[in-house]
């Protein structure tokens, strides 16, 4: 953890879910459909971070005591209004809506234990308080799958997005850039580049029907999106074909139309049509039922800028000069033989990754083709560096992907460039040295902050390399699969 001599780093808020919905037909990167108004779906964390040496922020508001069970939205609250004047009815409706939105999604198990989950109670997932000791599907695979698309609200239509069309790709970029994940203080918003979206959405095995858009019939404007990508997942002793669902996004002006649940039902249906009935997804909120919980940590690379944009703040008794000195890094990496990954390295990187991941309980199982897709360097998307020894053997590698955030309402700075730790495999080079070099490389490439989850072996280097702990958790979930929960150190899966 950071000590009081360090800056307090605002951590990116963890990924919110994009969820599955509809009669067990679905897969996701989960969304909190229990709270339709809170329709932002986090991937990598946007909120500024805490650290132990700085005074923690006071919570914006104390929660109001709630009577009875909670409801999913204002629309679900029955209120007798027949005899009230129109103005009074409007006031009551606004109050109900504000109360519902103000509750927000549960960020902790304690908060979640006080909620009712009317949507998730209908899905093949374990209940929050359930103790799971078995392994296997919650319900059997379905034989009878709906053939027709789900019905959208009047005036909207489905459209499978052709991301090979630059114009369509730009439309998706614009939708996400203007309506996707923001931090709790509305200071930062993820800025997925068009090239990043192609990397994230078109891995080997991608299907065009899984790039599921919603358009306005009259104007053809893109106002909603959800996606699925295939993934082979190893969970304890079982390997399953699953999907990851991501980028659930609904235009801000349509969030009262209940479009998100229909998107989730529809992507679920389309995935089931391909014979896939399990999913893995992550969420920054607590839903039934996490299989693992991780925390984001953040390492300042450009502390002056991070402080100026209020991503971080000066810890007490610290000056800007002392802070910059604290986070200063070497000019160049120190590991001999460290170089960018090349095409010839793909087989050995695949081999190293496969062998390394065997020690964890939740991991991807990648083909050589998938390793090429996810790890071969692409500028401003993915960086991978290998360590080649004196005998010409590749013994280790490090990797991080690029996900900037737009800085909103700042007179000088417009973008925050963040690196996210991906997979780091060591056999000869100490992991601490490998990750120290990762920080140096990220700094050389102009990144402002380096983010990492405390999964796999990451806890062994986070404090030593002056990472500050974030202020939110990232939950991992499995859809239609029961298994015991695991500690963060046994999670070996990183989702973009």
Curated annotation (Swiss-Prot):
Which GO biological process categories is it annotated with?
A: in utero embryonic development; ketone metabolic process; N-terminal peptidyl-glycine N-myristoylation; positive regulation of establishment of protein localization to mitochondrion; protein localization to membrane; regulation of opsin-mediated signaling pathway
Positions of the region Disordered?
A: 1-82
The record lists tetradecanoyl-CoA as bound by 118-120, 247-250, 256, 258-260
Which Pfam family would be a valid example here? NMT
What keywords would UniProt list here? Answer: Acyltransferase, Cytoplasm, Membrane, Phosphoprotein, Transferase
Task: Report how it sits in the membrane.
Answer: Peripheral membrane protein
Q: What is this protein called?
A: Glycylpeptide N-tetradecanoyltransferase 1
Q: Which organism is it from?
A: Homo sapiens (Human)
């Amino acid at each position: 953890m950071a000590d009081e001599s360090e800056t307090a780093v605002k951590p990116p808020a963890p990924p919110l879910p994009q969820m599955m919905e509809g009669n067990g037909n679905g897969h996701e990167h989960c969304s909190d459909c229990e709270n339709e108004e809170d329709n932002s779906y986090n991937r990598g964390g946007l909120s500024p971070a805490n650290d132990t040496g700085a005074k923690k922020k006071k919570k914006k508001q104390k929660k109001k005591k709630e009577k009875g069970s909670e409801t999913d939205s204002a629309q679900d609250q029955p209120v007798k209004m027949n005899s009230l004047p129109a103005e009074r009815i409007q006031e009551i409706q606004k109050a109900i809506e504000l109360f519902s939105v103000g509750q927000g999604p549960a960020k902790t198990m304690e908060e979640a234990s006080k909620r009712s989950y009317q949507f998730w109670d209908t899905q093949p997932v374990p209940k929050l308080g359930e103790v799971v000791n078995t392994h296997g599907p919650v319900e059997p695979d379905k034989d009878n799958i709906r053939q027709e698309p789900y019905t959208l609200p009047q005036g909207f239509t489905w459209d499978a997005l052709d991301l090979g069309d630059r114009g369509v790709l730009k439309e998706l970029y614009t939708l996400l850039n203007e309506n996707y994940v923001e931090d709790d203080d509305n200071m930062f918003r993820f800025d997925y580049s068009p090239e990043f979206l192609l990397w994230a959405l078109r891995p080997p095995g991608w299907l065009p029907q899984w790039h599921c858009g919603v358009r306005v019939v009259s104007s053809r404007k893109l106002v909603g999106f959800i996606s699925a990508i295939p993934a082979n997942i190893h969970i304890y002793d079982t390997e399953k074909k699953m999907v990851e669902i991501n980028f659930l996004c609904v235009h801000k002006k349509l969030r009262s139309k209940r479009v998100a649940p229909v998107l989730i039902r529809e992507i679920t249906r389309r995935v089931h049509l391909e014979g896939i009935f399990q999913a893995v997804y992550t969420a920054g909120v607590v839903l039934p039922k996490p299989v693992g919980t991780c925390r984001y940590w953040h390492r300042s690379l450009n502390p002056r800028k991070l402080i100026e944009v209020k991503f971080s703040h000066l810890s007490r008794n610290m000056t800007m000069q002392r802070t910059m000195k604290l986070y200063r890094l070497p000019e160049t990496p120190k590991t001999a033989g460290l170089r960018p990954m090349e095409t010839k390295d793909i087989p050995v990187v695949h081999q190293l990754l496969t062998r390394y991941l065997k020690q964890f309980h939740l991991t991807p199982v990648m083909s050589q083709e998938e390793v090429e897709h996810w790890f071969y360097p692409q500028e401003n998307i993915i960086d991978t560096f290998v360590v080649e020894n004196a005998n010409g053997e590749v013994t280790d590698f490090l990797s991080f992907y690029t996900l900037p955030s737009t800085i909103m309402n700042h007179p000088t700075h417009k973008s925050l460039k963040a690196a996210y730790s991906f997979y780091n495999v060591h056999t000869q080079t100490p992991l601490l040295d490998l990750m120290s070099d990762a920080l140096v490389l990220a700094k050389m490439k102009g990144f402002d902050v380096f983010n990492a989850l405390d999964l796999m072996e990451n806890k062994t280097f986070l404090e030593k390399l002056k990472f500050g702990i974030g202020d939110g958790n990232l939950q991992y979930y499995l859809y239609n699969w029961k298994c015991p929960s695991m500690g963060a150190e046994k999670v070996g899966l990183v989702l973009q």
